[in-house]
Amino acid sequence: MRAELAVYFIAGTQDIVRGTLPGVLEEALKAGITCFQYREKGAGSLQTASERKEMALECQQLCTKYQVPFIINDDVALALEIGADGIHVGQNDEEIRQVIASCAGKMKIGLSVHSVSEAEEAERLGAVDYIGVGPIFPTISKADAESVSGTAILEEIRRAGIKLPIVGIGGINETNSAEVLTAGADGVSVISAITRSDDCYSVIKQLKNPGYPS
């Protein structure tokens, strides 16, 4: 799981400023993302279940083509219906124990955490496969984001002895990803670093290899 978190792309139709979500996703897959989370939330997102399912299936087919895990954000029913590779939920989404009861053994389970105590609880549950930690930096992509924690939270979680794979979340781009990895994350998640980029190939190369020339 740790390798799959290296460059973890998150997006829904609401995040796309040019082209279409499948088009942007395929470019990112070609460029080397290692995981994709379909997150359809907020202003500009698809509103009906049928629209979301159709888009999820199209994105899933692309991920299958490029052999990259396809994860759905906060929609257990859809994830189970289409056989997603994983489900990711936040602290205020579907209750994690219910998610585990429905999904454990069928797909990977990811949980967002914002403190050492939440990370410890995720590890105690025994069925969470990885945690998303953040927001590390200020973000424009999530209107409901928690307060910024900085990279210190990653160091604190690792010092607490938590062994779960970690992906850093929030405001991460090719200029600051090295700080996130150095602090203890196994990978970085990005939204706007890819969706708003004119050259996602260069961005993804730098995310995978901090120090790669821009």
Swiss-Prot record:
Catalytic activity entry: 2-[(2R,5Z)-2-carboxy-4-methylthiazol-5(2H)-ylidene]ethyl phosphate + 4-amino-2-methyl-5-(diphosphooxymethyl)pyrimidine + 2 H(+) = thiamine phosphate + CO2 + diphosphate; 2-(2-carboxy-4-methylthiazol-5-yl)ethyl phosphate + 4-amino-2-methyl-5-(diphosphooxymethyl)pyrimidine + 2 H(+) = thiamine phosphate + CO2 + diphosphate; 4-methyl-5-(2-phosphooxyethyl)-thiazole + 4-amino-2-methyl-5-(diphosphooxymethyl)pyrimidine + H(+) = thiamine phosphate + diphosphate
UniProt keyword annotations, A-Z: Magnesium, Metal-binding, Thiamine biosynthesis, Transferase
EC number: 2.5.1.3
Cellular component aspect of the GO annotation: cytoplasm
Known cofactor(s): Mg(2+)
Binding positions (4-amino-2-methyl-5-(diphosphooxymethyl)pyrimidine): 37-41, 73, 112, 142
Pfam families (UniProt xref): TMP-TENI
Binding positions (2-[(2R,5Z)-2-carboxy-4-methylthiazol-5(2H)-ylidene]ethyl phosphate): 139-141, 171, 191-192
Pathway where this protein functions: Cofactor biosynthesis; thiamine diphosphate biosynthesis; thiamine phosphate from 4-amino-2-methyl-5-diphosphomethylpyrimidine and 4-methyl-5-(2-phosphoethyl)-thiazole: step 1/1
Keyword Magnesium in record: yes
Superkingdom field: Bacteria
Cofactor binding notes: Binds 1 Mg(2+) ion per subunit.
Recorded family membership: Belongs to the thiamine-phosphate synthase family.
PANTHER family attached to this UniProt entry: THIAMINE-PHOSPHATE PYROPHOSPHORYLASE, THIAMINE-PHOSPHATE SYNTHASE
Protein's job: Condenses 4-methyl-5-(beta-hydroxyethyl)thiazole monophosphate (THZ-P) and 2-methyl-4-amino-5-hydroxymethyl pyrimidine pyrophosphate (HMP-PP) to form thiamine monophosphate (TMP).
Name recorded for this polypeptide: Thiamine-phosphate synthase
Protein's gene: thiE
